[in-house]
From Swiss-Prot:
Cited function: Has hemolytic activity against human erythrocytes and antibacterial activity against the Gram-negative bacterium E.coli.
Cellular component annotations (GO), alphabetically ordered: extracellular region
Keyword Ribosomal protein annotated: no
Isoleucine amide modified-residue sites: I21
InterPro entries for this protein: Antimicrobial15 (IPR012518)
Localization: Secreted
Family: Belongs to the frog skin active peptide (FSAP) family. Ocellatin subfamily.
Keywords recorded for this protein, A-Z: Amidation, Amphibian defense peptide, Antibiotic, Antimicrobial, Cytolysis, Hemolysis, Secreted
Listed name of the protein: Ocellatin-2
Positions of disulphide bridges: none
Highest taxon of source: Eukaryota
Chain segments annotated as transmembrane: none
Tissue-level expression: Expressed by the skin dorsal glands.
């Protein structure tokens, strides 16, 4: 569902943020 897509996007954003730290 839409929430699943949002969750996947959030996970990717957090993953990229973690790499920058």
């Amino acid at each position: 569902g839409v929430l699943d897509i949002f969750k996947d996007a959030a996970k990717q954003i957090l993953a990229h943020a973690a790499e920058q730290i």
